[in-house]
Amino acid sequence: MSTRVIIGVALTLWIGTLAAVQASVAMAKNEIVIEGTKLNPPLFKTTVGERVTFVNRSGRTVHVEFLGDAGRHRMFQVTNEIWAIFHRAGSHPYEVHFSDPRARTLRGTVEAAEDPSGRGDPHTCDSLTVMDECIQP
């Protein structure tokens, strides 16, 4: 095997490992990172009542749209970051829109599971809280 092939394989493995580590760090921080062409991770798993931060690293202003029940939705402008708390278990889809209409809309989902400790979420909001604003279904 040539040295170039070995270096190429090693570089590929290193890049793959780096991407996996970045995804693990984001999940450990309860963060979803908005990049120019993708969400990291696109499917985020959390627990009901946990705070999830959406971090904008795209270099552009974006709007995060939380898709609600029966077509209801709310959109929030994000220059740096926003946070949300999901008060109901289940799938919570969202979209990220860029200010440039030529940019592709990014789609993701937050999966909120019931708290296994059984402590529950002592909330007053039935669905979703974004930056201290209750979004009702």
Regions found by a protein language model. Give the residues of each.
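Positively charged n-region of N-terminal signal peptides that target proteins for export
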Residues: 1-5
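Bacterial N-terminal signal peptides
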Residues: 8-18
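Bacterial Sec-dependent signal peptides at the C-terminal "C-region" and cleavage site
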Residues: 17-27
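N-terminal edge beta-strand
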Residues: 25-49
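Non-cytosolic beta-sheet module surface loops
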Residues: 36, 55-58, 98
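Beta-strand cores of secreted/periplasmic/IMS beta-sandwich domains, seen most often
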Residues: 42-63, 81-88, 92-93
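Histidine- and aromatic-enriched segments that form or immediately flank copper-ligand environments
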Residues: 59-78, 104-110
